[in-house]
Amino acid sequence: DEFSETVGFSIKGPNKTALFIPDINKWSQWERNIADQVQASDYALIDATFYDNGELPGRDMSKIPHPFVTETMAALSTLSKEHRAKVWFIHMNHTNPLLNLNSEQAKVVRAQGYNIATTGLRLPL
């Protein structure tokens, strides 16, 4: 396991709220339910370090405790389309295929109703 602290923020603006979780261990290790947290926010900016297992050839990815985007989408799959649209995947490793917005993986993410953040994204609060 990594020896680091994981921090997330709930940001409250005058009109909207944002959940900001740029780096977290697996969702099962968090004492809160990520789907509930997304529903309670206007925006959810969520850790997308890795898209799926096997992204780092030769590395045991179970030793790198970020939730895969595929795991996050599975955890949020029961949310309505309206709630899934609140999710913005952020903090992508250079190996993450979501960095290529034309990749098959990016198409899957968007087809399921989620968003992929890009440089310069601004969300009004």
Briefly describe each language-model feature range.
Residues 123-125:
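Generic detection of short hydrophobic beta-strand segments and adjacent strand-loop junctions
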